[in-house]
Amino acid sequence: MIDIAFSKLAIIGVAALVFIGPEKLPTVARMAGTLFGRAQRYINDVKSEVSREMELDELRKMHKDVQDAATDVERSIAQNISAADSSLHSAWDESDTDTNPLMEPPTLDQSSDKSKNFRKKKLAATSAVPSWYKRQSGQKSRVISGAARMAKFRPASARKSTPFFH
């Protein structure tokens, strides 16, 4: 703020001592300190208020720019939608007058060919891995329950051969 060196402060202090006197100098110094503090606080408040106003102006400008961009995007989307809508309506109107072979339902032969092709693709997808490889790698092809597995792999000595009815 103000550049005051120690020598200048000493000269001001000696002049104040001569003009004011030693009795009133402490009260005048206190009053000058409080006034100086008030002035500094007031200047800081004004600075912060000005910076806040500048930030608000910048935010208002940014808000306006964003709103303008949003309205431009909205207009362009609306134009694209209306253009697509008009082209769709014109294509629909043209298709009403002409018979389109793509819009006809498939015949019975076509649908049966499609289902046969699906079965062939499904069979090719499931049998892509040979069964000998499945057996060798240990992939299970059939799943059995836990009780059936226990009965299958139980040793002969552990099996009971008691009749069901006594």
Swiss-Prot record:
Keyword Phosphoprotein part of the UniProt annotation: no
Gene Ontology CC: TAT protein transport complex
UniProtKB keywords: Cell inner membrane, Cell membrane, Membrane, Protein transport, Translocation, Transmembrane, Transmembrane helix, Transport
Compartment list: Cell inner membrane
Molecular function via GO: protein transmembrane transporter activity
Entries under NCBIfam families matching the protein: tatB
Role played: Part of the twin-arginine translocation (Tat) system that transports large folded proteins containing a characteristic twin-arginine motif in their signal peptide across membranes. Together with TatC, TatB is part of a receptor directly interacting with Tat signal peptides. TatB may form an oligomeric binding site that transiently accommodates folded Tat precursor proteins before their translocation.
This protein's name: Sec-independent protein translocase protein TatB
Organism: Herminiimonas arsenicoxydans
GN (gene name): tatB
